[in-house]
Amino acid sequence: MKKTLISKLGLLGVISFLSYVAAVTFSPFAYEGYNPLAQAVSDLSAADAPSLMLWNRLSALYNVCETACVTVVCIAVSERKNKLFRTGVYLFAVMEWVSAVGFRAFPLSTSGFANTFQDVMHIAVTAVTVIFSVASLIVIIVAGAKDKEYRGIGVCAAVALTMMLVGALGMKIVPAAYFGVVERFSVFAATGFNAALGLCVFFGGFAFCKNAGQKAGTKTEQARVKEGTSESAEAERENIKNS
């Protein structure tokens, strides 16, 4: 089947994910003394970080493709009957836009937390994105549990939520020397799930489940028609005998 433009644009989520992975992987080489085991990813894009220029180059496609992808997903699911699933996707889209605009407008002023207005706003944006992330993923998980058509993406949402919780709890539990390790569970959860949504759209907008339902419905209808034809034939034979 020929892919529509909407389907093809679903791949923007994968491009966004790869751009983010490249930025997280290679930006530390431009930041002397950066310890990925202990430091947060946001330190790489701090206003005074020596890696800022490289980060901006490598992540150039990250925010653009991420917001474009989640917007495409919203369009793709807008006609779906499952209101709960649509709500979850819309909440996730709000989170992505808040994240893209908020973190670009308020990067950390320096590595760590300097308690400036910019840093406070960065933390506020983080709090909002976390709230919307958790809420959206829970809604999608529930939608997947109730409707088998969305069970696959519901499992992906459960994995993403688990990663977020591991990151959030891990940052409170593990020693400071390993803060960066658990923090990366959280930061990769959202962009990874965004890529998963985009891939679903690319491979038919969850149509594999929809088609399965259509095939089942078609078979049922064919059985009904066949049964009706048999009954009509039997009735006709009875009429002939009686006449």
Q: Language model features by range: what are they?
A:
Residues 179-227, 234-243:
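Long hydrophobic alpha-helical segments typical of transmembrane helices together
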Residues 4-33, 39-40, 44, 48-203:
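Hydrophobic, aromatic-enriched alpha-helical segments typical of multi-pass transmembrane helices
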